[in-house]
UniProtKB/Swiss-Prot annotation:
Location of this chain's protein in the cell: Membrane
Main location: membrane
UniProt keywords, alphabetically: Membrane, Transmembrane, Transmembrane helix
Top-level lineage group: Eukaryota
Name of protein: Uncharacterized protein ZK1321.1
Parts of the chain that traverse the membrane: 6-24
Length: 162
């Protein structure tokens, strides 16, 4: 009994250590979904290249166009602007888009499985600042009325007459 319990604990400990040190690369999504979600850096019209547009996720599934692995070919399927009946072609991905895609999905195996703990401050705090309250900060704000002053004076005069 003692042997099996220590054996199970050691197996559990080994699994725990290896699972913490081994990070799995994130699963690559459909390239065209990723292009649509990151259109702020992946849209070729933003770089004044109005010659083509990349396929939408729906078009990519329907038309079954493939330019291969985007990390290897650095391209994706698209169409020339203005002509939806034109044949599909492979167009180069914009550099910022390709860099972002490569950072996330090419080196995913080197990522940490959990974030690093926050680091301690490098400087030593020697004095604590006191917050000084002044009379100005203790004042209550004035209430601003939208009623004209003349109307208020007339109401006071009417009350005095009664």
């Amino acid at each position: 009994m003692q042997f099996s319990l220590s054996y199970l604990i050691s197996i559990f400990y080994i699994i725990l250590i290896t699972s913490e040190t081994t990070a799995f690369s994130p699963k690559r999504p459909n390239l065209y979904i990723w292009l649509a979600q990151n259109s702020y850096i992946c849209d070729p019209t933003l770089l004044n290249k109005r010659t083509h547009r990349f396929l939408t996720p729906w078009e990519s599934v329907r038309l079954r166009c493939s330019c291969g692995d985007p990390l290897a070919t650095k391209s994706a399927c698209g169409r020339k602007h203005g002509n939806s009946n034109q044949k599909l072609a492979c167009f180069r991905l914009p550099d910022p888009c390709l860099r972002e895609y490569a950072v996330i999905f090419e080196h995913g195996g080197n990522r940490l499985s959990v974030p690093l703990p926050p680091s301690k401050p490098h400087r030593i705090v020697t004095a604590v600042r006191k917050t000084v309250t002044t009379k100005h900060s203790q004042r209550t704000p004035k209430i601003v009325s939208t009623i004209p002053v003349g109307a208020v004076l007339r109401v006071k005069k009417v009350k005095e007459k009664l």
